[in-house]
Structure formats: structure tokens, C-alpha cells
Amino acid sequence: MGGVSGTADNTKIFGDMIPDWAKELNCSITVCDKDGVIVYQNDRAVEQYRKRGDLIGRNLFDCHNEKSAAIIRNLLATGGTNSYTIEKNGVHKMIFQSAWKENGFVAGLCEISMI
């Protein structure tokens, strides 16, 4: 995957793989590569994780506990999906995680968080 770069206006899109409609979609979208390095966040994800700073280029395993990291590693190894609901600070969320592929091989993980 070439040339991931971040800009102040959050056009942190790798190639043309993320369509324009994802940028302002009313859910949080975070995408990482196969090593767990975050390569994309839409506007909602940037806002959701603002207190952690710019996450593009950081490893998502640094942001998860061991149990969650093990699930993510399994998804990356198997190309699988995972979905669950959580409640944090009285807010209910639905989380969907799925490996994404490039030329038939797992290239990373996409997480969609819906409130």
C-alpha cells in the first residue's frame, strides 16, 4: 500500500480505495493495514478519538487491551469478521470489524462503530 499521508483536513486516504461517501458518513470508520498500522479514519472517527491525537500511522494494538488485540490478530490471520455491542458512559454502540482484502489476500482491518 503506497503513500499514506495525513493532512489537517483529514483527507488521509490511501490511494483511491476509500470512497468520498465514507468521509462524512454518520458512523466512525477506522482502517488499518495488515500490521495494525492505522491508515485511514473518517471525520467521525477523528472526532471520536480526538483526545488521543492523530492516530494515522500509529499501531492500533497500542490502543487495545490484550483480549481485544487477540481478536484483531485472529481477524487479520483468518480474514474473518466480528461484531458486538458495547456500552461506554451510557452510550450504546454497535461495532463491526472485518478484514479487508487486496488481490485475494488480507491487507488489513476495517472497524465501523455505530451509535
Regions found by a protein language model. Give the residues of each.
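Short, low-complexity N-terminal regulatory "tails/caps" that precede and couple sensory modules
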Residues: 1-12, 106-110, 114-115
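Sensory modules in modular signal-transduction proteins
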Residues: 6-37, 41
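Sensory/regulatory domains in signal-transduction proteins
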Residues: 44-115
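Feature targets compositionally biased, intrinsically disordered low-complexity regions
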Residues: 1-5, 14, 78-79, 89
